[in-house]
Amino acid sequence: MSDTTDLIRQKLAALEPAKIDIIDDSARHAGHAGARGGGGHYSVIIVSSQFSGKTALARHRLVYDTLRELMHKHIHALSVKAYTPEESDLIH
């Protein structure tokens, strides 16, 4: 697990996730302009009751706001899938 992955996990703990998966996709983007600047590419799948009653856009904003201080320096690109526990049960 990378240091940035650990930082993402620590920050997202504020959302009290029931489940969180963080995938470092940076190696797939080697040579990409963002990779040269040090920011990595990450995918996050997060399940939290804090997403209940929120639109997909509001959920993404909540995740991005939580990770704001990591954006650009540590994170160049971020893919987010945010679910409530009930939605997660239906998917998995």
Language-model-detected regions and their locations in the chain:
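C-terminal structural segments of small proteins and small subunits
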Residues: 57, 61-92
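Conserved interaction-surface patches within small, structured recognition/assembly domains
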Residues: 43-53, 76, 81
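Residues within mature, well-folded domains
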Residues: 28, 49, 85-88
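Ordered, soluble secondary-structure elements with a strong preference for glycine-centered loop motifs
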Residues: 2, 53-57
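N-terminal first-folded block
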Residues: 2-34
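Hydrophobic aliphatic residue packing
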Residues: 8, 22, 44-47, 63
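A generic structural signal for short beta-strands and their flanking turns/coil linkers
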Residues: 16-18, 38-42, 74-78
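A short, structured beta-strand/loop element
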Residues: 31-48
